[in-house]
Amino acid sequence: MDIDREKEGKCLTVTVPCYNSESYLERCVESLLKERDGLEIILVDDGSTDRTGQLADQYARAYPDVVRVVHKKNGGHGSGVNAGLMLANGIYFKVVDSDDWLDEAAFHKLMSVLRFWCRTKEEKRPDLVVCNYVYDHLEEGKTKAVRYGNLFPEQKICRWDEIGCFSPEQYLVMHALIFRTGVLYNCGLKLPEHTFYVDNLFANCPLPFVQRIYYLNEDLYHYYLG
């Protein structure tokens, strides 16, 4: 990671790719703004034809030290992630889709942990932080949490040879992961444009570059299923 970017003092960059998201963008962004200390939010307006871009600009004006906006022609979800990663100043990087949101209490604990790691020497920081995520069927009033407590030791950094065996429902997905930004740069991550399921590439391509892992047993990410 570029040394000058680390000196910006941002601990976490959250990139939110947005396309025609005016009906739910507020829920997403408001969940992120609960933790502004050390946080950078990059809203990537991917050529929206509704008021998404205007809403994003309103947040940037209201929170100029936290929120940045990118307006670009439509390139798909992967293109939005790429745009956010190129501008990221945070030591850590996470993607949150615009129709999803983060749990307030879990996000507070995550940011507390990340702020601690960001104050330590680079060689002592985890390359990857893993949290639980929740499938939210809002219309049906049903939720299903995917947790990793049987796989990773808690409250310590571990390596791959210290974790358990994954069940078919416990594969690592984008929603569960917070990468050190330098890992994403080192692996040369660039997602294809106009392509479905690029979140699988985001989750898996950097893993060979990950050595140190920290598991936070919190239901952080809410994945909206309409």
Model-inferred region functions:
Residues 1-226:
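Nucleotide-sugar donor-binding/catalytic module of glycosyltransferases
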